[in-house]
Amino acid sequence: MELNIDTNCITYLKSLQSLPLQQAISLWDNLKEINYAKLKSMKPSIYIDIDGTLAYFYRNGRGFTYEEMFFPENHYFRNLEPHIYMIYLVETLSKFRDVCIISSADYKTIQDKYEWIKEYLPFISDDNIFFCPLGVDKTKFVKGNAEKSILIDDYNLNLEAWDKNGGVAIKAINNINTPTERFVHINVRDKENWLKSQMESSDDEQIEKLKAKIIEMQIKNWVKADTEFIKQVLNINERCN
């Protein structure tokens, strides 16, 4: 089912709360595309995944089975530990570029994911928060600009769909996946370990300088890719010095 709406994703999801739960779940699960008329953009954005990219995702489920992760009473997604490196990266990028969150979600876990975003990324407005049903093409649930934009995600199928649509796919390497030559990548796990070692002996002023250095280091890696938009992002480096 394709949906055309004049609001943002969060407002639409709140409207579903007035429906019986099973009806809302059915509507959500059958969506294949949402067109956001007021948010449609021809300018590039940077879309970033949550599970395994902005937040740790645990192969063992932290004591929950795969099915139990989606039980709303377990609040699995609400309690995921953030990747501090990625939080800093997003915080700095958002000062100079249109940064959005795009996360696949079971309907019953969306509230927990939304609260997680508001806790760790309060600077991201509701207009820049997007959810989509599990297993769908993320390019169909953003601002209509996927072919001009970057997706940072840890899951190959999401990256492949984004790349096929003409966008730039960057793979987040975390604690449970591996690099591939097909995609530019960001090694979240190694960067996280480096950041933690630096922060142990840093005061607030030094931490702010670390944030700038994070951007500088990451962009130097991305610019090696033969992608014009990634090269344009290098302009941020000048503002971080």
What are these regions (language model features)?
Residues 27-30, 175-200, 206, 210, ...:
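Charged phosphate-binding loop/patch that engages nucleotide di/tri-phosphates or the phosphate backbone
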